[in-house]
């Protein structure tokens, strides 16, 4: 099995892991109700997806 020859310092480890952070998700705007929602999902405020009513949403 492969074993590292030398120890990696904490700084070197953190530099390598600098790209592992979570990225913020982008928001799209619903064409029906103009609310922000996550792309490729049903709009949670009106229930539309791709211009079609997919589910009914109860108004509060």
Swiss-Prot record:
One of its GO terms (molecular function) is structural constituent of ribosome. Residues 1-23 are annotated as: Disordered. One of its GO terms (biological process) is translation. Pfam families: Ribosomal_L32p. The keyword Electron transport does not apply. The keyword NADP does not apply. InterPro entries: Ribosomal_bL32 (IPR002677), Ribosomal_bL32_bact (IPR044957), Ribosomal_zn-bd (IPR011332). It comes from the Bacteria. One of its GO terms (cellular component) is large ribosomal subunit. Transmembrane segments: none annotated. Keywords: Ribonucleoprotein, Ribosomal protein. Belongs to the bacterial ribosomal protein bL32 family. PANTHER family: 50S RIBOSOMAL PROTEIN L32, LARGE RIBOSOMAL SUBUNIT PROTEIN BL32. This is Large ribosomal subunit protein bL32.
């Amino acid at each position: 099995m492969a074993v590292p020859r030398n120890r990696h310092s904490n700084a070197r480890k953190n530099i390598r892991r600098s790209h592992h952070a979570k990225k913020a998700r982008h928001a799209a705007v619903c064409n029906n109700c103009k609310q922000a929602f996550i792309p490729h999902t049903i709009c949670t405020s009106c229930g539309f997806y791709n211009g079609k009513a997919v589910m009914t949403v109860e108004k509060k």
